[in-house]
């Protein structure tokens, strides 16, 4: 039987607390990726210092106006890359895994499908240390659709595919936030 997470109750607007670690961190320990609306991003404050930086960055501006290319939010700890992507079919895409950072993706214009695997990644390419990316194959466990106003947060070590073709959808403009693990999170992934 699949066990679905019970998300924390959203806080009233204006009462977002930085002390939600006790509510949100168990989601990251017991479950896979997070899929939610951008309006709910403040509910995830307190999970990670570097994720907090990205959440505050997103909530403070109209991200649809971000320029194409790479923008540093906090040095190399938090970076956003905005690009236009031509979606591909799932059979043509490899799963990817990042061991030293989490990835938050949102579509600025258009829609795409994504897949996440709860299984181990079988590498088919050597790890690119510069981008912390390992490509390979894995069984699909979760699939969904990403569109404007929604985000997917892929956890470190979690195989996923994104930028997959959704029926009736063409090119899309997306923002990909690469977020380094906090030092205490790195210790947890090494255990």
Predicted regions and their residues:
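Short, conserved beta-strand element in jelly-roll/cupin
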Residues: 99-112, 118-120, 127-133, 178-179
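A short, N-terminal "cap"/entry segment at the start of jelly-roll beta-barrel domains
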Residues: 2-82, 92-97
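Conserved metal-binding segment of the jelly-roll/cupin
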Residues: 145-164
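Conserved short histidine dyad/triad with adjacent acidic residue
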Residues: 80-98, 108-122
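A short beta-loop-beta micro-motif enriched in histidine and acidic residues
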Residues: 75, 91-103, 120-125, 139, ...
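Short acidic (Asp/Glu) patches
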Residues: 83-99, 127-140, 159-161
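A short hydrophobic beta-strand segment most commonly corresponding to one strand
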Residues: 151-153, 169-186
């Amino acid at each position: 039987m699949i066990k679905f997470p019970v998300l924390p109750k959203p806080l009233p607007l204006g009462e977002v607390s930085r002390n939600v670690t006790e509510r949100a961190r168990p989601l990251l320990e017991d479950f896979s990726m997070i899929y939610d609306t951008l309006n709910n991003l403040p509910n995830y404050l307190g999970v990670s210092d570097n994720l907090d930086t990205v959440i505050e960055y997103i909530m403070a501006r109209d991200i649809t106006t971000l320029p194409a290319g790479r923008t540093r939010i906090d040095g190399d700890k938090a970076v956003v890359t905005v690009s236009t992507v031509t979606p591909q079919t799932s059979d043509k895409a490899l799963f990817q895994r990042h061991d030293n950072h989490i990835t938050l993706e949102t579509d600025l214009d258009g829609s795409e499908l994504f897949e996440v695997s709860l299984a181990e990644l079988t590498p088919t390419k050597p790890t690119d240390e510069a981008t912390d990316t390992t490509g390979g194959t894995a069984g699909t466990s979760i699939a969904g659709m990403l569109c404007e106003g929604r985000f997917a947060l892929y956890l470190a070590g979690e195989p996923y595919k994104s930028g997959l073709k959704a029926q009736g959808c063409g090119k899309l403009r997306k923002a990909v936030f690469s977020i380094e693990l906090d030092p205490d999170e790195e210790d947890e992934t090494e255990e």
